[in-house]
Amino acid sequence: MLKTISGTLALSLIIAASVHQAQAATTYNAVVSKSSSDGKTFKTIADAIASAPAGSTPFVILIKNGVYNERLTITRNNLLLKGESRNGAVIAAATAAGTLKSDGSKWGTAGSSTITISAKDFSAQSLTIRNDFDFPANQAKSDSDSSKIKDTQAVALYVTKSGDRAYFKDVSLVGYQDTLYVSGGRSFFSDCRISGTVDFIFGDGTALFNNCDLVSRYRADVKSGNVSGYLTAPSTNINQKYGLVITNSRVIRESDSVPAKSYGLGRPWHPTTTFSDGRYADPNAIGQTVFLNTSMDNHIYGWDKMSGKDKNGNTIWFNPEDSRFFEYKSYGAGAAVSKDRRQLTDAQAAEYTQSKVLGDWTPTLP
């Protein structure tokens, strides 16, 4: 017995030493810490990013635990932000679409983002990105209160059309309305947690989510029996094969306070767009959301419709059956098979592998 215990202890020490050596072997080009600053340690993430040399060689920044109240726009290719821990290293800001700039104009949805990615080969690992706009407090205000913000979209992460091959590993995205905006290129989210209320994953980009938690939040401002929100609002162009693809993941509630059948899996967003003959809902935005092998709690009721404006400014409705909304082997209390929840065949589901969705890109960390 003593020999067995000794052998086990020795093996544990070897494993621990190997892990320590692997961590120690990681090379960081810059370190961000709330507590110290020297030639290679910065107090803000923005300063650390600014220290990266021109070019596209990999540049890795370690972010020590702490809350960093910053708004960042990433334009440098091949940058990795690596947190000390997912819950400990937090990047946060509190801007809504209706928040006013110094010149009196509104930030708008895209402008509200805590982090904006306009670069190729960006990566983030083991950190949290939050938009701390206080949606519940704002909704609790009277409509006659002049301080109440009407445009409550508040983006935590925005991948722009200039971004491509954006990789997020073990990252938490926290917000309410419009938490994650994927507008361009390809993004991959692995082992992530994304929480919100209304359309909290949206856009026309290609984004693959694997082994992620999609968390629907409680809304005190919604009356019992009414819809609280929607997980996705894709605006995928009809000529684009892939939109929002969720595989091997979990659709869960923030708490038991989130009512049954209060959240839709998605609704079709046809963004108002300027054309040669006017400004109206984009008819070519035939959004795609697909859930494969994903568990669903009982707060899910299915898909929903979404409104837009026609050429004359009249309200029109876009229905889920006219979009590319599908499921494959959903399970759990919120799963169902019906004419309103279309299912993929085995052959169709085989078209949604990582290599097919992401094409010639295999996500790796620097």
UniProtKB/Swiss-Prot annotation:
One GO molecular-function entry: pectinesterase activity
What start and end residues bound the annotated signal peptide? 1-24
Q: In which pathway does it act?
A: Glycan metabolism; pectin degradation; 2-dehydro-3-deoxy-D-gluconate from pectin: step 1/5
Q: Which top class of enzyme applies to this chain?
A: hydrolase
Q: Which UniProt keywords apply?
A: Aspartyl esterase, Cell wall biogenesis/degradation, Disulfide bond, Hydrolase, Secreted, Signal
Which catalysed reactions does the entry list for this protein? [(1->4)-alpha-D-galacturonosyl methyl ester](n) + n H2O = [(1->4)-alpha-D-galacturonosyl](n) + n methanol + n H(+)
The Gene Ontology biological process terms listed for this entry are: cell wall modification; pectin catabolic process
Residues holding substrate? 109, 153, 219, 226, 230, 267, 269, 272
Q: Where in the cell is it found?
A: Secreted
Catalytic site: 178, 199
Q: Which Pfam families match?
A: Pectinesterase
Metal-binding as a keyword of this entry, yes or no, is no
Stated EC number for the protein is 3.1.1.11
Q: List the disulfide bonds.
A: 192-212
Kindly list the residues the record flags as site (Transition state stabilizer). 177
Q: Which residues form a coiled coil?
A: none
Q: What does this protein do?
A: Involved in maceration and soft-rotting of plant tissue.
The subunit structure is:
Monomer.
User: Family, per the entry?
Assistant: Belongs to the pectinesterase family.
Extract the NCBIfam families matched here: pecestase_PemA
What name appears for this protein in its UniProt entry? Pectinesterase A
| Organism this protein belongs to | Dickeya chrysanthemi
